[in-house]
């Protein structure tokens, strides 16, 4: 097996956000194909790791992004451990990986989760031009790059003159190898848990609600989309909202209880909710990159209704009838798409799992390292 060293720049164990989950699951499945060591933040929970070595060398404070002592420490680990390649999650520690590569001679790979400067620009951060300059530098210095979306890869090639030969696709993966056989059972379980009638369409929204793009999407559901759905008097449904970080001023969505809204908070078995759901809503308007929760929802058999921005990054040709997109900010069309779908009879195509199943992804990446 190839010996690989990876650096994960922020806490990801246990995971709560899509970004954390992406790192955790990618490294877990990569470790099945390689002999993997990961350098992470000291606040990670090592008890959740079973198949790779986790070194808690990164400080929990922001100073970890400028800790020059890591250059020598990681270089020594590369030499004594016999590592053949270095993977950098996100561009934030690209400077460190570049210097370690120069000292040791091993290639380094940049695993991008978004075009980061675009994400922060869409969120109104003043310092996005600084990140843009640094991120472009990192792309050019890396030996190879993994891209989460075809759009990000095309942007790098066209706008930053990155050779396409340096680029590889690495989408957010799913742990389920095929269409679930227990959708009816899971729907009954979740419906019973929340007092939902058997003839009501179960609609799901999920995400880390302290993240502004997700919170904005939730407010669009509450204030724009749901009132339009309610106007369709013959449509029986409930919308379950899952996710931690809901602002206190929304009072656990108590004022929306009579408007078909259920707030479930953070749920440990989110896969059960994905499997139970008839529809999944993704009215995201900003944030960049792929919406990982949407990838999982389709894998577990839900039909996704998404804005064009929300559908960014997903490989649409493998989704079949399970992805419905509407223009951004067209909430009338969004609500109509929901009521038109109701309980979808379509199943997720086999080609979807061929592309997004984690084991397939890890094997493809390991063969290229």
Regions inferred by a protein language model and the residue ranges of each:
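Active-site proximal beta-strand in glycosyltransferases
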Residues: 4, 101-120
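Conserved catalytic-core segment of nucleotide-activated headgroup transferases in glycan assembly
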Residues: 22-28, 176-252, 263, 267-268
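Membrane-proximal helix-turn-helix segments that form the acceptor-binding/catalytic region
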Residues: 126-145
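Carbohydrate-associated surface elements
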Residues: 151, 173
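A charged, aromatic-enriched C-terminal amphipathic alpha-helix characteristic of glycosyltransferases
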Residues: 343-369
């Amino acid at each position: 097996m190839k010996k690989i060293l990876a650096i994960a720049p922020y806490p990801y164990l246990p995971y709560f956000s899509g970004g954390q989950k992406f790192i955790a699951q990618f490294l877990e499945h990569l470790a099945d194909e390689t002999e993997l060591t990961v350098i992470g933040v000291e606040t990670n929970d090592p008890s959740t790791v079973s198949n790779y070595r986790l070194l808690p060398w990164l400080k929990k404070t922001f100073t970890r992004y400028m800790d020059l002592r890591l250059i020598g420490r990681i270089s020594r680990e590369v030499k004594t451990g016999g590592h053949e390649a270095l993977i950098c999650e996100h561009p934030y520690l690209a400077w460190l990986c570049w210097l370690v590569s120069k000292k040791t001679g091993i290639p380094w790979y940049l695993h991008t989760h978004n075009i980061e400067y675009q994400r922060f620009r869409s969120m109104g951060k003043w310092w996005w031009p600084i990140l843009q300059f640094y991120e472009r530098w990192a792309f050019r210095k890396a030996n190879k790059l993994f891209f989460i979306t075809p759009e990000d890869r095309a942007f790098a090639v066209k706008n930053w003159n990155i050779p396409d030969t340096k680029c590889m696709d690495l989408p957010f993966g799913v742990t389920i190898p095929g269409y679930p056989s227990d959708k009816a059972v899971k729907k009954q379980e979740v419906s019973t848990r929340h007092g939902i009638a058997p003839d009501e369409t179960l609609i799901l929204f999920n995400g880390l609600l302290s993240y502004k793009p997700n919170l904005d999407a939730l407010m669009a559901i509450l204030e724009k989309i749901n009132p339009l759905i309610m106007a369709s008097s013959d449509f029986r449904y409930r919308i379950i909202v899952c996710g931690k970080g809901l602002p206190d001023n929304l009072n656990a969505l108590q004022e929306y209880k009579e408007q078909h809204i259920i707030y479930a908070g953070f749920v440990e078995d989110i896969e059960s909710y994905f499997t139970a759901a008839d529809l999944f809503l993704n009215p995201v308007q900003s944030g960049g990159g792929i919406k990982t929760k949407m990838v999982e929802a389709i894998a577990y058999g839900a039909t996704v209704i998404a804005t064009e921005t929300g559908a960014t990054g997903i490989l649409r040709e493998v989704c079949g009838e399970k992805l419905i997109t509407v223009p951004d900010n067209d909430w009338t069309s969004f609500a109509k798409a929901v009521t038109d779908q109701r309980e979808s009879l379509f199943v997720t195509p086999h080609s979807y799992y061929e592309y997004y199943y984690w084991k397939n992804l890890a094997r493809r990446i390991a063969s290229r390292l």
